[in-house]
Amino acid sequence: MAASLQAAATVMPAKIGGRASSARPSSHVARAFGVDAGARITCSLQSDIREVASKCADAAKMAGFALATSALLVSGATAEGAPKRLTFDEIQSKTYMEVKGTGTANQCPTIDGGVDSFPFKAGKYEMKKFCLEPTSFTVKAEGIQKNEPPRFQKTKLMTRLTYTLDEMEGPLEVRRRRTLKFEEKDGIDYAAVTVQLPGGERVAFLFTVKQLVATGKPESFRPFLVPSYRGSSFLDPKGRGGSTGYDNAGALPRGGRGDEEELAKENVKNASSSTGNITLSVTKSKPETGEVIGVFESVQPSDTDLEAPKDVKIQGVWYAQLESN
């Protein structure tokens, strides 16, 4: 913020001319300094050199404070950045009013201390409070430039901060040779999300890990079910739908051009579920409390209009508590 204020208060050299330059302070800054909001601070070459320098310096300071104040008003709560990540006990100790509007409710807890390994012995556990918090969404799509191959592109989130999956649970089996198997059974295991590509196209999907069966080692254990984002009666902008609407928008397309598969994706609507894959990695654990944290990367299809899905890559952090059976 100090760098922003310094940049805002810097005066760029200007060409000296015969016309007077003026600056009008904003109403918020004017009230703070006791200046009329409608008043103008004028710097004229007809005045004494010292008076000119003094007035111009005052005008520059006023403009700098006005710019900095406007930036704070526009940025609002984001001026301080993301909230500090709290432990599970710290979150539980806070009241509703202390959490409201801070962004903490959309975050997974972290661990204070712990070890950089997975020291849990072989056996059967119950994984509870399983939380998945995305930190980035990228969508595989063609680039803006012509003939650019499809690649995962950064997106802009269009929905509110309600995309974190939480309170999930299921059995976890720690086998010999440090292999794991986890089955997701219950919890808030899906969230509707819409993101926007750089070209303006919006992609809707359900971020989910329904019926997840993850197996592997703690460094990387991973298909899961991706329900349809929309129902079969949904109609796309051209009136095509699964159980209602047109089969094709207008006349049937002429075949033989090599684009039959692409046209079928757009025309034949399908509301059935698809599958996705996720990779979970353990980065730290706390054996005395049974807490585990890590990072994940999930690749699943989107469901913009019941077909022609795009691949969505979701990366983020996760948290869980293990209880021995």
Curated annotation (Swiss-Prot):
Stabilizes the manganese cluster which is the primary site of water splitting. Pfam families: MSP. Its main location: plastid. GO terms for cellular component: chloroplast thylakoid membrane; photosystem II oxygen evolving complex. Belongs to the PsbO family. Keywords: Chloroplast, Manganese, Membrane, Photosynthesis, Photosystem II, Plastid, Thylakoid, Transit peptide. InterPro entries: OMP/PagP_b-brl, PsbO. It comes from Triticum aestivum (Wheat). One of its GO terms (biological process) is photosystem II stabilization. GO terms for molecular function: oxygen evolving activity. Residues 236-260 are annotated as: Disordered. This is Oxygen-evolving enhancer protein 1, chloroplastic. Residues 1-79 form a transit peptide. It is found in: Plastid, Chloroplast thylakoid membrane.
